[in-house]
Regions:
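Short, contiguous pre-domain boundary segments
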Residues: 1-15
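Hydrophobic alpha-helical scaffolding
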Residues: 16, 42, 75, 112, ...
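Long beta-strand-rich cores associated with HINT superfamily self-processing modules
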Residues: 245-358
Length: 358
């Protein structure tokens, strides 16, 4: 369980001392406001807003977002009203907390309704301040991580709402890491037996493919070393909900879904991305698959995602397993994983650097 001291130490890495102090003050205020309240898990209630703030800190969110995270249930669950928060913490934080409270009251009954009327309400809230949505997504993520304390019927309802509403919104905002964790947690809560079966099958498949994956990894590393190109190479794992959904929607077997090797190469500069692409397209024994190259650096996706995508195959081996490769810069990788939250961080970092320069 996180502590306020541990969180403050992490915040010292990217926030000003006065901002860290303000986050601490919001925590102690929430601790007092929620005094005597407990979570269904038996923990003190303040452990939840602290965990939500910790999630946002991993996205490098600003101090006002973290303060709102600490206070996000105060209006809903205590005697404190919006004016009281405004008096203590200012209009911006009060508006953020009020926005999160209003989103909490939205009821999502069907997928069609959620995509129409209620999604429009969320879009309006996003237009006012995107941070309202980010706090709400972090709130939902922690609730999903601790959903085991809920009754089975509540778990299924919350899991469906997470799959239908919150995971797609995270996807629209380019927050890939958060989206797939929400989807996997919801899958585990809604279909626990299917989740366990696929998890076991994935573990077995990864063991079988370990030697082949190492061969491809070594070939890619040798390729970059030979051309003196900087890059970190890592494997990409398919998440369990994604595997299940592909099996169901595309009528594919588990082996067909898993029969793909996936790698990501992260480098320093945009120019280097294209040089790495040229190098991997000329690998010994491997050839690019025609028609499978995508340049999302030149033409980014609507959510800001940027990367080069290509697919290789082992020439003349009789093994037709595709090797999917993504190539991107560190900043592109951060934005691909954290979406608008990372945009926010880079914008604020650049603003602070400019102020220091002036």
């Amino acid at each position: 369980m996180p502590t306020i001291d541990a969180l403050a130490e992490r915040l010292d890495e990217y926030l000003e001392p006065a901002q860290v102090k303000a986050v601490r003050r919001a925590y102690y205020y929430a601790e007092q406001a929620h005094d005597g309240q407990m979570r269904k898990s038996g923990e003190a209630y303040v452990s939840h807003p602290l965990a939500v703030a910790s999630i946002l800190s991993s996205m490098h969110m600003d101090h006002e977002s973290l303060m709102a995270a600490m206070l996000h249930d105060v209006i809903e669950d205590t005697q404190v009203d919006k004016q009281g928060l405004e008096d203590q913490f200012g209009i911006t934080v009060a508006n953020l907390v009020d926005g999160v409270s209003k989103l909490t009251h939205l009821e999502f009954k069907t997928r069609a309704e959620s995509q129409a009327h209620n999604f429009q309400k969320m879009a309006i809230a996003m237009a006012k301040d995107i941070r309202v949505i980010l706090v709400k997504l972090a709130d939902r993520l922690h609730n999903m991580r601790t959903i085991g304390a809920m009754r089975p019927d509540s778990r299924r309802r919350i899991a469906k709402e997470t799959t239908d509403i919150y995971a797609p919104i995270a996807g629209r905002l380019g927050m890939h890491d958060l989206k797939i964790e929400l989807e996997d947690l919801a899958f585990a809560a809604y279909h626990p037996m299917r989740y366990r079966h696929i998890k076991a099958a994935v573990a077995a498949a990864r063991g079988e493919r370990k030697a082949l994956l190492q061969q491809v990894q070594i070939a890619l590393e040798d390729c970059l070393d030979h051309d003196e190109l900087p890059g970190l190479i890592g494997g990409r794992q398919k998440h369990l909900a994604g595997i299940y959904n592909k099996m169901r929607e595309q009528s594919k077997s588990f082996r067909e879904i898993m029969d793909v090797f996936a790698f990501r190469i992260v480098t320093n500069e945009v120019d280097t991305c294209y040089r790495i692409l040229g190098a991997v397209h000329h690998l010994n024994l491997y050839r690019p698959v025609p028609g499978r190259f995508k340049d999302y650096i030149a033409i980014p996706k609507s959510n800001g995602y940027q990367s080069l995508h290509t697919t290789l195959y082992r020439a003349g081996s009789g093994v037709h397993t595709p090797i999917e490769i993504q190539i991107r810069t560190k900043e592109m990788d951060d934005i691909a994983n954290h979406g608008v939250a990372e945009h926010w961080f880079y914008k604020n970092t650049n603003s602070r650097a400019q102020r220091a320069h002036n």
